[in-house]
């Protein structure tokens, strides 16, 4: 049962959204609060012929629809200092925007204990991959 709709939350220049398009996702929405990032994402969508929508907004606050999949590589830290408020904002948005049977994937540095914080928002949290300095955390609303 392949997910249909995908949200890149905090898309930056759109790397994850473009990669998702290359994997066959057709309904892609990318959002960020940085104008330069949104401009770069729009250009990358055009260059790679991604059929997607790029929307300005703060952690998905302007979105109402729910998505089958959410991908996020959030700026949770500066150096080794972790921004707990920003982490909570992205997790709250993901919980609100994720379809009941959907899954969200977060790319984070290994030293960020996202798994622990995510359990406050999602009944199912697990690390699905690790490479170098990064790990991939999957969360879902179904336990």
Segments predicted by a language model, with ranges:
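Short hydrophobic/aromatic-enriched beta-strand-loop microsegments
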Residues: 54, 124-130
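Core SAM-dependent methyltransferase catalytic element
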Residues: 130-143
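Conserved class I S-adenosyl-L-methionine
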Residues: 109-122
């Amino acid at each position: 049962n392949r997910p249909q709709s995908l949200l890149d939350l905090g898309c930056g220049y759109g790397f994850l959204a473009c990669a998702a398009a290359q994997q066959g996702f057709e309904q892609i929405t990318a959002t960020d609060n940085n104008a330069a990032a949104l401009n770069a994402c729009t250009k990358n969508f055009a260059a790679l012929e991604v059929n997607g929508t790029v929307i300005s907004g703060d952690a998905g606050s302007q979105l109402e629809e729910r998505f089958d999949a959410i991908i996020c590589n959030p700026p949770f830290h500066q150096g080794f200092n972790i921004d707990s408020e920003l982490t909570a904002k992205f997790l709250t948005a993901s919980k609100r925007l994720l379809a009941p049977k959907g899954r969200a994937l977060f790319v984070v540095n290994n030293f960020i204990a996202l798994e622990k914080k995510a359990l406050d928002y999602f009944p199912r949290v697990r690390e699905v991959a690790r490479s170098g300095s990064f790990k991939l955390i999957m969360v879902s609303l179904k336990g």
